[in-house]
């Protein structure tokens, strides 16, 4: 798996009105914008992650039909229902966990997802490490950083990030490939 910069292109006001029939055209537009970003940045290649939480079946099918293969999910249980039957149909599918992860859901998360973007505390890092070893999987992980330093949001505060990343890499042997920042 190559290391990519994640580019999230979103517009809240357009998201609710975007018709399924326009999805392919919108994906093509976003892919053109990513291609422009690629041409100006040789070190990292942006990847388009389609956030599929709460999306109806027909929208996900339209995205898949239009060639989208990287999806972000917020909840483990919803992702299991949504993607279990599709995994066999789309072997190149990449699922990313982008929502909070409770330690009691780690077994299922490691089994289902290809990337974990929400490593935010030592207990979770240790649990992920143990479960990945048990399942024989070594998933790329992102450390979640709470850049806004807001107590109601998850994530490591910026001044603790270096120490936590070292813990994840050195003590837990996690493959930390980047940061997922929450403003």
Spans of model-derived segments:
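Conserved alpha/beta-domain cores
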Residues: 2-183
């Amino acid at each position: 798996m190559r290391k990519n910069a994640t580019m999230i292109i979103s517009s809240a006001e357009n998201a609710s009105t975007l018709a399924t029939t326009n999805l392919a055209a919108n994906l093509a537009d976003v892919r053109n914008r990513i291609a422009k970003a690629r041409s100006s940045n040789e070190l990292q290649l942006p990847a388009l992650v389609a956030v599929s939480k709460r999306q109806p079946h027909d929208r996900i099918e339209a995205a898949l039909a239009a060639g989208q293969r990287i999806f972000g999910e917020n909840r483990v249980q919803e992702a299991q229902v949504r993607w279990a039957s599709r995994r066999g149909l789309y072997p190149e599918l990449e699922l990313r966990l982008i929502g909070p992860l409770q330690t009691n859901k780690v077994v299922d998360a490691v089994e289902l997802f290809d990337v974990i973007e929400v490593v935010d505390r030592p207990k979770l890092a240790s649990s992920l490490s143990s479960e990945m070893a048990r399942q024989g999987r070594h998933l790329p992980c992102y450390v979640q950083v709470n850049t806004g330093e807001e107590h109601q949001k998850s994530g490591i505060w910026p001044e603790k990030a270096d120490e936590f990343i070292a813990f994840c890499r050195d003590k837990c042997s996690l493959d930390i490939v980047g940061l997922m920042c929450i403003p």
